[in-house]
């Protein structure tokens, strides 16, 4: 079967790809979210604080996920996206498994860096691949279906983590009697890491690479030197990329000024919070990204103009991350909130919160994409109306209701409402960003979009 027929818009291979990519995203968030349900045991075992857990859940993961996502996006724009997704899935699953061998805060941090690097390959590639497989008219719905894996994975991660943790700790109160001397939280990391490696083999053989730009009739030839292009994108994150410019001295001066401003900001935030690791990592990540934007303006003028000169793109990159800014913090500390305020066990939280997260968010993300596409047929800003209604109004009601409700059951109901609202924006936001750029730069734009979500939502 020819590649053209394999990549028929909305056809058989498109549906297979969408189904498998949902599974990939489920594993993406199982491996990411499981840390929150294991947090209390990890804190006790490794002797670390809430700030350290916040660093592991947010900054350690978020900075690497965000920054490495840019060259990964470039690789997805110039190489085989199916291969990149499969390799990335195998790598982050291995890093999750190795997290179960961690004996210190440092080693666990390194493995979380690895998870972030591996996962950075997934969504930019998936956004680009699915945009070629399906018509722009249903793009928000398709990307919402893909993004539902995020919430299903988060829910399953809580459930599996809690179940493995409680079962293991009950079976082996003395961990020295457990297989390989593993503790419950270590067994949980290993238990969710292995299946992802198996899934990577399936995605490699069953997802077909579509013709780039086919769904819009803007067929783009693949790059002849994809790895060289990606290496240039890596170099673009550093000031070295500015030395080859005609006005290199001026560029270096501007770059140094940006670096100084970022340093002053991070130093002030460190003095305010006392969290050296978080603001050091965030500052380095922000500096690398600002350097990349500066170098992109010289290396790829068209991409720079579409991503950073158009008002729609700028507003998108600033506004959309404000929703996960609340959401990631909410998700990271929800288990601890119910343990400390409502006396719930890890297994109870894993079951109830896991189901609430999975079901509520699935309803929100699919509904958001569907109604976004329908409203877009009638109003130019239809998808944005959906984002505001769900991502702002419903989210605020659910968040404050959960925190201030005195009854556990009422709090859980508001938690459900929160997850419906907070997931509405995902497909509509991703579609808005991918529609603003050309097919050849879709993955890179998607990577920068995810970067803004992560650097503002996760790392902050």
Question: Could you describe each region identified by the protein language model?
Answer:
Residues 47, 80, 101-107, 118, ...:
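Helix-breaking motifs and short loop linkers at transmembrane-helix boundaries and internal kinks
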Residues 78-89, 373-390:
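Cytoplasmic membrane-interface "Motif A"-like loop-to-helix N-cap segments
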Residues 380-429:
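C-terminal transmembrane helical hairpin of 12-TM major facilitator-type secondary transporters
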Residues 183-205, 278-285, 395:
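Symmetry-related core transmembrane helices of the 12-TM Major Facilitator Superfamily/SLC fold
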Residues 56-74, 127, 355-368:
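Central cavity-lining transmembrane alpha-helices of secondary-active solute carriers
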Residues 38-67:
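Extracellular/periplasmic helix-loop-helix junction of adjacent transmembrane segments
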Residues 67-106:
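Conserved MFS/SLC helix-loop-helix module at the cytosolic interface between two early adjacent transmembrane helices
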Residues 35-36, 248-281, 311-358, 365, ...:
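Extracytoplasmic gate region of multi-pass secondary transporters
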């Amino acid at each position: 079967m020819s590649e053209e027929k394999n990549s028929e818009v909305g056809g058989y291979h498109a549906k297979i790809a969408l189904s498998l990519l949902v599974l990939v995203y489920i594993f993406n968030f199982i491996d990411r979210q499981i840390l929150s349900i294991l947090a209390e045991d990890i804190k006790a075992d490794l002797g670390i604080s809430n700030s350290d857990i916040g660093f592991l859940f947010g900054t350690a993961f978020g900075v690497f996920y965000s920054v490495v996502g840019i060259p990964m996006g470039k690789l997805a724009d110039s190489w085989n996206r199916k291969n990149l997704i499969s390799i990335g899935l195998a790598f982050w699953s291995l890093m999750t498994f190795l997290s179960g061998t961690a004996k210190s805060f440092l080693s666990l941090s390194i493995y979380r860096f690895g998870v972030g690097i591996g996962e950075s390959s997934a969504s930019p590639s998936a956004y680009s691949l699915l945009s070629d497989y399906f018509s722009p008219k249903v793009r928000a719905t398709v990307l919402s279906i893909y993004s539902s894996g995020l919430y299903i994975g988060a829910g399953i991660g809580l459930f599996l983590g809690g179940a493995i943790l409680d079962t293991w700790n009950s079976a082996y109160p003395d961990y020295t009697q457990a297989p390989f001397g593993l503790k419950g939280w270590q067994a949980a990391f290993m238990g969710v890491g292995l299946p992802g490696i198996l899934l990577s083999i399936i995605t490699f053989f069953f997802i077909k690479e579509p013709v780039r730009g086919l769904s819009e009739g803007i067929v783009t030839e693949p790059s002849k030197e994809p790895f060289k292009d990606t290496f240039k994108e890596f170099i673009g994150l550093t000031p070295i990329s500015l030395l080859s410019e005609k006005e290199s001295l001026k560029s270096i001066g501007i770059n140094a000024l940006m670096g100084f401003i970022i340093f002053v900001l991070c130093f002030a935030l460190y003095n305010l919070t006392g969290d050296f690791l978080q603001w050091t990592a965030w500052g380095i990540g922000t500096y690398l990204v600002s350097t990349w934007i500066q170098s992109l303006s010289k290396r790829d003028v068209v991409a720079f103009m579409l991503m950073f000169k158009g008002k729609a793109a700028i507003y998108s990159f600033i506004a959309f991350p404000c929703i996960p800014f609340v959401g990631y913090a909410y998700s990271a500390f929800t288990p601890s909130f119910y343990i400390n305020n409502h006396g719930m066990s890890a297994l109870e939280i894993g079951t109830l919160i896991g189901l609430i997260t999975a079901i509520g968010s699935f309803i929100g993300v699919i509904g958001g994409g569907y109604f976004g596409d329908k409203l877009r047929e009638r109003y130019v800003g239809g998808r944005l109306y959906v984002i505001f209604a769900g991502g702002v109004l419903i989210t605020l009601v659910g968040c404050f209701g959960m925190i201030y409700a005195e009854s556990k059951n009422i709090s859980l109901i508001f938690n459900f409402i929160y997850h419906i609202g907070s997931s509405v924006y995902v497909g509509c936001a991703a579609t808005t960003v991918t529609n603003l750029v050309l097919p050849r730069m879709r993955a890179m734009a998607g990577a920068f979009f995810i970067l803004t979500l992560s650097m503002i939502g996760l790392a902050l």
